[in-house]
From Swiss-Prot:
GO terms for molecular function: 2 iron, 2 sulfur cluster binding; 4 iron, 4 sulfur cluster binding; electron transfer activity; iron-sulfur cluster binding; metal ion binding; oxidoreductase activity, acting on the CH-CH group of donors. [2Fe-2S] cluster binds at C53, C58, C61, C73. This is Fumarate reductase (CoM/CoB) subunit B. It comes from Methanothermobacter marburgensis (strain ATCC BAA-927 / DSM 2133 / JCM 14651 / NBRC 100331 / OCM 82 / Marburg) (Methanobacterium thermoautotrophicum). SUPFAM superfamilies: 2Fe-2S ferredoxin-like (SSF54292), alpha-helical ferredoxin (SSF46548). The keyword 4Fe-4S applies.
Length: 489
């Protein structure tokens, strides 16, 4: 037998939603939909839900299981599962009202707009960008999972950004889609990738819709935001996305030309957080690796790619190619830099063997005898590491290897902190709201420190904790923690 809880609610009848518990026979590979049907049959429960195709093609059966959106016809039910409706107005139980979304689609003119008459011919190469976005089955998993929608009414959400982009990239369409996207909150997206993670059709809305629509907005003069223009100016003039305060990390360390391992610092480690870079050198030295910090490296270009300002990216890629070529491995300590070097650079013809520091160390961590670090810590998954690079287990393996360390998970692993996608600079109120939610999760854990592997997340979480009166909680890069465990002091 397994136990399944279902959130029941009928507006106008029930005062508030409530969970009801059901025990049902366990069957191999039982789907959530099968479980709901069995509950109704066994208990005469009359739970309301939608389903149609049972093949993952219609999208009607989307629900939440243990807080994550799934298709009931495809997801296997878990013992102890809590089944809830997606985050739309409830008609009854798991059945939600989609009319508000459908009305908005009509109001926004989300249909092919063209004055042309007769048959319009379209070349296959001109159809590729829009073709990627035509697989949506309207399950609205993305809307239910998007962290920004919950914090801002300005943002229409990933479903609508995909819809706008589908026509924006269609050469037959004549509407001003990029400007329309900006009006609907195009620059509110943190590019956290949660929508892509839950999409049953694996549509990459941040990469294939939002970032490309932002690039179109920049070309057509509808974007970017003023704060993003300032960052572009800074990168164009200095090669870095942040101001130079004091002596930079790269100019502080000597070159090690014999090494086959290169360290790509990123802007913040070089100009603002040199201690993280120093910790990396010490930690890798303990493992017997001497690392070179190549001169001539500049901003990876991520802030420009995420905000659609592509005209200077090719130059940044070329400068970094010259700086990084010849190494067997490039190590990063910034999630955004790592994701950009791995995923975006190949589109510019640059292939590098890039590893996040946690990937490099995870299989070597048992080689070092560490001293106890008596702290209680949690770990923040940077979006561009967890979803952008698929790195989840490696940081946890490292944390669990440190003697004396008590590691506890956050309530919602992988919850965006709000610092990415140009939101921290362009829409600071959204970043602050998401940061507050992250801080509240951390408050519940009573930890000494939050560990992460992204300087942008690190600084933003630190700011968020201080604003919520939690300034005594440290925010550390995982290298700083390892440096403590390796140190003889």
């Amino acid at each position: 037998m397994i136990n399944v809880k279902v959130l029941r609610f009928e507006p106008g009848v029930d005062e508030k939603p409530h969970l009801e518990s059901y025990d049902i026979p366990s069957k191999e590979k039982m789907k959530v939909l099968d479980a709901l049907q069995l509950i109704n049959k066994m208990y005469n429960a009359n739970i309301a839900f939608r389903s149609s195709c049972r093949a993952g093609q219609c999208g009607s059966c989307a629900v939440k299981m243990n807080g994550e959106v799934v298709l009931a016809c495809r997801a296997e039910v878990e013992d102890g599962a809590v089944i809830e409706p997606v985050d739309l107005p409830v008609i009854k139980d798991l059945m939600v009202d989609r009319s508000e979304i459908e009305d908005k689609v009509r109001a926004m003119g989300l249909y092919l707009q063209s004055e042309a008459r007769g048959i319009q011919r379209i070349k296959p190469e001109d159809y590729q960008d829009t073709k990627k976005l035509r697989g949506c089955i309207e399950c609205f998993s993305c809307i239910s999972s998007c962290p920004v929608i919950k914090e801002s009414t300005e943002y229409a959400g990933p479903y609508f950004m995909r819809y706008i982009s589908k026509f924006a990239f269609d050469p037959r369409d004549e509407a001003e889609r990029a400007a329309g996207g900006v009006e609907e909150g195009l620059y509110c997206c943190t590019t956290c990738g949660k929508c892509a993670e839950v999409c049953p059709k694996e549509l990459n809305v941040p990469g294939d819709a939002i970032e490309k629509l932002r690039a179109m907005a920049c070309r057509e003069g509808a974007g970017p935001l003023d704060a993003h223009r300032k960052i572009k100016k800074l990168i164009s003039e200095t090669g870095r996305s942040v101001d130079h305060i004091g002596k930079g990390f790269i100019e502080s360390v000597g070159q090690n030309p014999g090494s086959r391992i290169g360290f790509f610092t990123g802007c913040l480690v070089d100009y603002r957080m040199p201690d993280v870079g120093m910790a990396l050198l010490r930690v890798l030295r303990e493992h017997g690796f001497e690392v070179d910090v190549p001169d001539g490296q500049v901003c990876c270009g991520s802030p420009m790619i995420r905000t659609g300002q592509l005209d200077i990216v090719e130059d940044l890629v070329e400068r970094n190619r010259r700086a990084l070529e010849g190494y067997d491995t490039i190590i990063t300590v910034c999630a955004g830099c790592g994701a950009t070097l791995k995923k975006d650079y190949p589109r510019y013809g640059v292939e590098l063997n890039v590893l996040d520091i946690s990937e490099f160390l995870a299989d070597r961590i048992d080689d070092i005898k560490m001293k106890p670090v008596n702290m209680r810590v949690t770990y923040h998954d940077p979006c561009h590491l967890l979803r952008g690079q698929g790195v989840k287990l490696e940081p946890r393996k490292i944390l669990n290897s440190i003697p004396g360390l008590e590691f506890v998970e956050m309530e919602k692993q992988g919850q965006c902190c709000g610092s990415g996608g140009g939101v921290k600079s362009g829409k600071p109120e959204i970043a602050e709201s998401l940061g507050k939610k992250k801080a509240e999760m951390i408050r519940k854990l009573n930890v000494d420190a939050v560990i992460t592997i992204c300087p942008f997340c690190q600084l933003h979480i630190k700011d968020s904790l201080e604003k919520e009166g939690l300034g005594d909680v440290k925010v550390m890069n995982i290298l700083e923690l390892l440096d403590m465990a390796y140190s003889d002091d």
